[in-house]
Amino acid sequence: MRKLALSDEILLSIEKPARYIGGEVNAVMKDPDKVDIRFCMCFPDVYEIGMSHLGIQILYDMFNRREDVWCERVYSPWPDLDAILRREKIPLFSLESQSPVRDFDFLGITIQYEMCYTNILQILDLAGIPLHGAERGETDPVVIGGGPCTYNPEPLAEFFDLFYIGEGEVVYGALFDAYKENRRQSGSREDFLKRAARIPGIYVPSLYHASYHEDGTLADFHPLCPEAPERVEKQLVMDFDGAPYPEAPVVPYLKATQDRVVLEIQRGCIRGCRFCQAG
């Protein structure tokens, strides 16, 4: 039986403790000693909002179908628990195993809207992960950004090790295989980032130089090494009939913001307006 990261005293003192205990219907449990990669999936908002998001459910199910990967979840804590974690020096933890987020191989953060940017910094700070990618060492998780806001990644570039540009079902398998191969060859963190940069749709900010005009607009942008492509192409799912989809989605114990069945009948928009991420 797993041990909860929070004591009964703390759980009884905070609002909606079910946000933090995990153990929901269809939550995936694995033996950490029998997987090669531990991935912590983060929706940087409160549990009720994150559990309403279908994209997280799709990737969670897809990753956990691999025997060599265990994907867990973490969400932004409410201010009451945020204060307790800081006061008691309890590191932010995943729901499934209640393990510290900083102990994972990857921390994947979906960036759905700009208003969650400060929550991303909160997640990193509470987890004890250095805020800036350049400050992270060999034992820190690789921090990945995904979701619609990665179409303009530069405002957050210094906080992420890499960005996945496009739809998540396409090249994560190649990224995991590259990580395993880099580990097998005793490669460094930098070696892995260079391997990752060769994968279509993966943008590694540290492998590029960006300069700006006085008004903040981009003046120059170019790769710093041969592994980084001149242009990162977004990844698209071309066959939705063959795309993974959760057969047993995680069912929360408390009421989610969208307290109903979620079905995807269409993705994106055919109009292609230049100001819109969906198009």
Whereabouts are the PLM-identified features?
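N-terminal [4Fe-4S]-dependent radical SAM core
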Residues: 10-40, 47-48, 205, 211-262
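Low-complexity, highly charged intrinsically disordered N-terminal segments
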Residues: 39, 44, 50-61, 68-85, ...
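Glycine-rich beta-alpha loop elements in corrinoid/cobalamin-binding modules
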Residues: 76-223
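Conserved, mostly hydrophobic/aromatic
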Residues: 63, 107, 161, 269, ...
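Canonical Radical SAM [4Fe-4S] cluster-binding loop centered on the CxxxCxxC motif
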Residues: 53, 255-279
